[in-house]
Amino acid sequence: FNDNQKEQIKLGLKNGIDISIYAKPVFNYKEMEQIRLGLEKKLDVSIYAKAEFTQYQMEQIRLGLEEGVDVSIYAKSDFSSAKMEEIRIGLEHKIDVSIYANNNFNSAQMEEIRKALIVGKNVFLVANKEFNWQQMKQIRLGILQQLDISLYTNKKFNWQQMEQIRLGLKKNLDISIYANPKFNYNQMEQIR
């Protein structure tokens, strides 16, 4: 064990916890720390005290256990810690994470879908894996602003073009003049 690992073992002994669960060379000191923190809070660390998880994944699982959410939904090594975080936050808000708790979306896309779900908006317009997270954000913002998003939910528009169309709709402008993929976002902004 290196000095950092030894320090985690000492802290565990000092706090009267069973260090045998994490005093293993397979865990780096940050992973040991996540397991120790869970043990100190009397959590079932067996869910994440596994070499297949990184320290960051372990942290997301530990935080979910602390909040009492069903971590089995995301305690899977094929989810990055960032994806785990989006699923955990969704569970904490008591939303149906099944819409985005899969590897079809990256963590930024998951965040946009989660934000739409939290405010109770029609997430199926946002949860389209053909859109990147920035496009999803423009769609979500349009829904929140009660705009006719059908005028720009087209994968031919990049997110910056979508933003220019959304901003025009927000100001009740005639966007038909510039809502065309042939105009780049700078041109759209000038016309708007």
Q: Could you tell me what each predicted segment is?
A:
Residues 1-192:
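General marker for long, soluble alpha-helical cores
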